């Protein structure tokens, strides 16, 4: 990719990556380690936590999406606007993948996680290279993270299915936050 894309375009994507990393911290909130450590989580509680991460992911993605205008104005890079808009999908899928991924780690399915990651990164890398060859420019750099987060979620949710609740029990969230708050800080 380095031979196909200008260094300036790498810089623009690097700016967006640093900013999205900040938003990602708030989407996780230490929930994954709390799920791994807690031995008393029922399926119902896990569904509550999954629903919470979904709604949190929607909120943080919208916040990042709306922040893209001030970000692009601050850095005087109009291309940052569309990059941030597209990367907001990455934030959402990373957030909703917290519970299924934590359950995979909790169940010590490391081989599955490794194969899943290898498969997704190879496919995403090939797609990114093909996009760069076809002239996608800096968009070729964000295809892989977006594609990867979506595909990892699809694979993980099929392996560890969760049910969406439109409301979630505050007791379940409070129970998990008693541990995750320390992880977050």
Regions found by a protein language model. Give the residues of each.
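Interhelical loop/hinge segments that connect adjacent transmembrane helices in multipass membrane
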Residues: 111, 115, 154-185
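Membrane-interface helix-loop junctions in multi-pass transport and translocation proteins
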Residues: 2-17, 69-73, 81-85, 108-111, ...
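Membrane-water interface segments that mark the loop-to-transmembrane alpha-helix transition
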Residues: 12, 16, 25-69, 82-88, ...
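Primarily residues marking transmembrane-helix entry/exit sites
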Residues: 10, 45-46, 80, 138, ...
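Alpha-helical transmembrane segments of multi-pass membrane proteins
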Residues: 22-26, 62-66, 77-103, 114-122, ...
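Membrane-interface junctions at transmembrane-helix termini in multi-pass inner-membrane proteins
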Residues: 34-43, 93-116, 139, 160, ...
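Hydrophobic/aromatic residues in alpha-helical transmembrane segments
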Residues: 1, 28-32, 67, 100-101, ...
């Amino acid at each position: 990719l380095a031979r196909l894309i200008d260094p300036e375009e790498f810089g623009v994507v690097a700016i967006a990556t640093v900013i999205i990393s900040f938003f990602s911290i708030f989407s996780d909130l230490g929930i994954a380690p709390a799920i791994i450590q807690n031995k008393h989580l029922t399926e119902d509680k896990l569904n509550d936590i999954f629903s919470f991460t979904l709604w949190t992911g929607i909120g943080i993605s919208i916040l990042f999406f709306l922040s893209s205008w001030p970000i692009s104005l601050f850095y005087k890079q109009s291309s940052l606007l569309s990059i941030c808009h597209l990367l907001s999908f990455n934030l959402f899928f990373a957030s909703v993948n917290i519970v299924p991924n934590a359950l995979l780690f909790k169940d010590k399915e490391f081989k599955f996680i490794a194969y899943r990651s290898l498969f997704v990164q190879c496919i995403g890398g090939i797609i990114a290279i093909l996009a760069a060859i076809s002239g996608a420019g800096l968009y070729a750099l964000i295809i892989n993270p977006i594609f990867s987060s979506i595909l990892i979620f699809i694979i993980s949710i099929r392996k560890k299915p969760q049910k969406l609740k439109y409301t979630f029990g505050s007791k379940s969230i409070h129970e998990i936050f008693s541990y995750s708050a320390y992880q977050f800080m």
